[in-house]
Amino acid sequence: SRFDRGMLLEMDFDAYHPRIIADIIGYELPSNSIHEYFGKQYFGKETISEEEYEASKKITFRLLYGGIDKDFEKVPFFGKTKKYIYNLWNTFKKRGYVVTPFMKRPLYKNCLHDMNPNKLFNYLLQASETEYNLSMINNVNDLLCEYNSELVLYTYDSLLFDFDLKDGKDLILKLQSVMNQAGRFPVKTKAGANYHVMTDMTSRIS
């Protein structure tokens, strides 16, 4: 940290892409672990083991990026997602373009090559992620204008701050509020003297 009394503060989104998809298709996900939420549906259990939790993560990302198998359409989130992909593809073929859900930017057929339904959906998802982040970072920077702390690094699902301890817990709570957007995108918080010694502080800051 550049501050005498400072630390690095990292805030990252929990399962960012699935939550963006939920926002796009109008599906309400729980604020706690979605891998546990989906795992219970995949395995038909009220409680899942650690092995099933890890398997749930792999299944979810395979379905989102590799296509949704017919067997998993019965899981409501994925059934609704598959229907959205089908309608998106039909619109793309009919009109020659689709628009991003958030900023309404067109994605034109003549600029995208070798497309298929799932590839188009992944293009749209990545574009939506960028648009969500641009809006969120603008709001974060507006908030930071009144403080010493600074945003120093952005990756697709996390922000890293050089945090001045003088700014206090109040700023951390405000940053969490800006990023989670009324609970739509839950945020995990870590802090440490450097990037290699970050400690999870999510449960301590609320």
Residue ranges and their predicted role:
Residues 1-206:
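Conserved catalytic core of nucleotide polymerization and phosphodiester-bond processing enzymes
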